[in-house]
Amino acid sequence: MSRLFGTDGVRGLANGLLTAELALSLAQAAAVVLGHDQLAEGKRPRAVIARDPRASGEFIGAAVEAGLASAGVDVYDAGVLPTPAAAYLIASLDADFGVMISASHNPAADNGIKFFARGGQKLADDAEDAIEAQLKVKPHRPTGVGVGRIQRFSDAEDRYILHLLTTLPHRLDGLTVVLDCAHGAASGCSPQVFKDAGAKVIVIGAEPDGLNINDGVGSTHLGPLQEAVVANGADLGIAHDGDADRCLAVDHEGNVIDGDQIMAILALALKADGKLKDNVLVATVMSNLGLKIALREAGISIRETAVGDRYVLEAMRQGGFNLGGEQSGHVIFADHATTGDGVLTGLQLAAQVARTRRSLQQLATAMTKLPQLMINVKGVDKTRAQTDEGVREAVARAEQELGQTGRVLLRPSGTEALVRVMVEAGDMATATRICEDLAEVIEKRLALAV
């Protein structure tokens, strides 16, 4: 059987790959692996569970709760909450582990199960492997007083909101903010916390019905937010995805502010306050070169990682850094959160607008994005992308031409016979020409036999 765990837990079509039976079995296996220390002492481990509002979350969540309780785990059901809220509650309650039922930015038909370790930390690969291995072992099934209890956690959202408010460096009084909640998990808490922080709030995409999550709204569909910001004369707009672990923004003229620009604004603010640990930002190789150039001029260095927030988190933990993220809008404030938090990020960004009395558009000029083009070259031997002599020579020529004003990145797909070619340059014409030339070389040199 292929590995169940992907880059962000177990995810797939609800009632297709992700059945109630699998959810129950995964929960029983996780109870043994993540609750081992408590079970070994004859105690009941404690776990927090939350979900986004997609319809399938109810039966999958019920199956997970049944699996946990039947394996001797006391369950605290936090209901519909963002993924980062679940992580926060796991840490604040000192629970042994937690579970989030969500497929993030995926369509409503999909769902997922993501486990967190003690402290609200993402699971290491070896812990996921151990859970998969435990699926093949007879479940731990206590009886009598050994079975777990299930409790509804009535003030979970309030606790999360209070936590977010304590992180604010400045209130939002006088700001008008449009929030697009993607008909997702932040539909309740995000508008409330922005109001509590003093902003005038206009809300779209906050009427979840179980089937409309991410449907034409949210961080993957920014059109409605752009229109609402301009139509209402708002200062800025904030877009979440289905589980609110990411944030993209829109300035007062409707221009998109991506994760790189958000990180630039926040890194500079933290450095100015003397709060950016070691003056380092952690970002992935996909972040725009303009981010590195702007921060280097400000005395901030970037630690690059592979693509994926788990790699950003790993580098942050290893180096003790407190700010990192991705161009997609996953931004991690290690001083306040253990994972990407879209509501927290939106609050911090809005606070800088209020604090500096500069528009988001003005703040975003902190970095100049280099024109960037990506081409997916399909049907090629991706394993040779870094070793083929002809490809290496073509890349070297491109890098020599670009010099310090651009870069080339080849990324083999993890799941397909495909190589992604990304080029940044001082102008789009140059980026396009070089990217197309490299794609042609890769297609010719690495083509798979038909």
From Swiss-Prot:
**Matching Pfam families, A to Z?**
PGM_PMM_I, PGM_PMM_II, PGM_PMM_III, PGM_PMM_IV
Which co-factors does it depend on?
Mg(2+)
GO BP terms, alphabetized: carbohydrate metabolic process; peptidoglycan biosynthetic process; UDP-N-acetylglucosamine biosynthetic process
Q: Which reaction does it catalyse?
A: alpha-D-glucosamine 1-phosphate = D-glucosamine 6-phosphate
**Known post-translational modifications?**
Activated by phosphorylation.
Residues binding Mg(2+) are: S104, D241, D243, D245
Origin: domain of life: Bacteria
Q: What is its EC number?
A: 5.4.2.10
Q: How is the cofactor bound?
A: Binds 1 Mg(2+) ion per subunit.
SUPFAM superfamilies, alphabetically?
Phosphoglucomutase, C-terminal domain (SSF55957), Phosphoglucomutase, first 3 domains (SSF53738)
Concerning InterPro entries, the annotation shows: A-D-PHexomutase_a/b/a-I (IPR005844), A-D-PHexomutase_a/b/a-I/II/III (IPR016055), A-D-PHexomutase_a/b/a-II (IPR005845), A-D-PHexomutase_a/b/a-III (IPR005846), A-D-PHexomutase_C (IPR005843), A-D-PHexomutase_C_sf (IPR036900), A-D-PHexomutase_CS (IPR016066), Alpha-D-phosphohexomutase_SF (IPR005841)
What name is this protein filed under? Answer: Phosphoglucosamine mutase
Q: Where is the organism placed in the taxonomic lineage, from the top? A: Bacteria, Bacillati, Actinomycetota, Actinomycetes, Micrococcales
